Amino acid sequence: VKLVMPRGSEKLYRKAPGWNHFFGEVKQAREVCNPEACLIPTPMDLKVNAKAAPLQVAGNWKIVAADGLANEQEHAERILKERVEQHKDLKKGGQLTMTLALDETLADNEAYTLDVQQKGVVIKGKTAAGVFYGLMTFDQLLRGDASKVGCDAIPQLSLKDQPRTHVRELMVDPCRIFVPYEDLKAFVPEMARYKLNMLHLHLVDDQAWTIEIKKYPRLTAEASSRWGMDDMLMPIKGYYTQEQMRDFVAYCAKYHIQVVPEIEMPGHEVAAISVYPELTCQGVQKPIRTTCGVSDELLCPGNDFTYEFLGNVFKELADIFPSEYIHLGGDEAGNPALDCWTYCPKCQALKKKLGITTTDRSENWKLQGYLFDKVIDLLRTQYHKTPMFWYETDFKKI
């Protein structure tokens, strides 16, 4: 088999200096950016004045920010330092001006307007978040495409934008493959660039427990390391301390991103079960999983320790994560579904107490509903949290 391709074309696919996972590398700057090609997501309304002289971005910039926008001013300074050739003294001012202001007439809390003029840029937002998203749009215009190099000029334009949805989430799973803390932080500015506003941390699964719980130190001491997934003969280990997570939450807040922790239940809990087998119906210790798939090891809804354990875990999480949301998982609860509860005396006693007359697995889902109802009531009444779940979970209190 002979591969036919232009001579030298393989060089186009080599990793250039400065390459990373988030953007490609372009060696030469574009002269004038094309807003319609470089803005992701597409703004709600964009008008480009192609006949007017474009904004030449190289120069000394002056930033004028309204009260309450100190964080956004810092981001503006960072963007200009990273993207613009001449920026020797941003505070002293110069030929170009960036104005950051609030506009209460805008309809949505995350709405903003951006006007590019020949001598500068005006960004207005309903709130500081709106101003921030305007800055992220300006950053994309400065890049001109997906590169670090950027453009020499931006056409004069008027842009109005607001989110199509208010939950724009990225999920990161440090359980299957642990993500070191500094690498986790690297996701944040790239999320913000595309106006994602929620980082869903999948902290618990069959393969690892990755968040420090001071009430239960054995969780991270014994359940945060294992051999690699699916015959990868390399150790996987690591967890986040509470101090790291508090720092991470504060770091994300600067990018208007909230962090939502997830604690799976009743399935995907083998890591915890490996340390505390009394969480299950059988009370038998099981090893941490080193493969994907669905485990039939579940938390026992008829066991008082299950609720004691979850209550203590959520008490500490509520103190770390100020987000209004906590994710409770709920997916893939056993294979066959919830079958281990069929033969559990505690679960059968709970069924009888709840007036469930079947003894087979046909109504075991009602026990899952009972488990979630108790946890949801705890989260809402004591910690004022709103629960989130995977799509297959459907109970009236959710």
Residue spans of the language-model regions?
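Alpha-helical structural signal in soluble globular domains
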Residues: A16, R83, Y251, Y255, ...
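Acidic, contiguous N-terminal accessory segments
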Residues: E31-H166, T358, L378-T381, M388-K396
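Extracytoplasmic/secreted cell-surface and envelope-processing proteins
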Residues: K11-R14, Q73, W209-I211, H268-A271, ...
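Active-site neighborhood of glycoside hydrolase catalytic domains
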Residues: A272, P277, R289-T290, V294-I398
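Feature activates predominantly on carbohydrate-active enzymes
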Residues: L106-Y325
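Solvent-exposed loop and capping/linker segments of extracellular ligand-binding repeat ectodomains
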Residues: V1-E31
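Short, solvent-exposed loop/turn elements at domain surfaces
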Residues: K11-R14, A70-E74, A107-D108, I177-P180
